[in-house]
């Protein structure tokens, strides 16, 4: 979990910007979006295969 301590004489906007950066770097939101709904293993395999095919195409 991302943790940000507000430094002395630091504005709230700067602290929020720093927090958002740490969250995005840690991948917390991406992981949340990925696990928001249950995905059957067969569907997961299908999506993975399609993504690989798409990458190979380009």
Swiss-Prot record:
Pfam families membership: Ribosomal_S21
Alphabetically ordered keywords of this record: Ribonucleoprotein, Ribosomal protein
One Gene Ontology term, aspect cellular component: ribosome
The keyword Ribosomal protein appears for this protein: yes
Top-level taxon: Bacteria
Gene3D superfamilies the record matches: Ribosomal protein S8
Recorded coiled-coil stretches: none
Record GO biological process: translation
Keyword match Oxidoreductase: no
One Gene Ontology term of the molecular function aspect: structural constituent of ribosome
PROSITE patterns: RIBOSOMAL_S21
Family, per entry: Belongs to the bacterial ribosomal protein bS21 family.
Protein name: Small ribosomal subunit protein bS21
Organism classification: Bacteria, Bacillati, Bacillota, Bacilli, Lactobacillales
């Amino acid at each position: 979990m991302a943790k940000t301590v507000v430094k002395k004489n630091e504005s709230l906007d700067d602290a929020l910007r720093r927090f958002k950066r740490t969250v995005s770097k840690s991948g917390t939101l991406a992981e949340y979006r990925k696990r928001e709904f249950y995905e059957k293993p067969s569907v997961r395999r299908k999506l993975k295969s399609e993504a690989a095919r798409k990458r190979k195409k380009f």
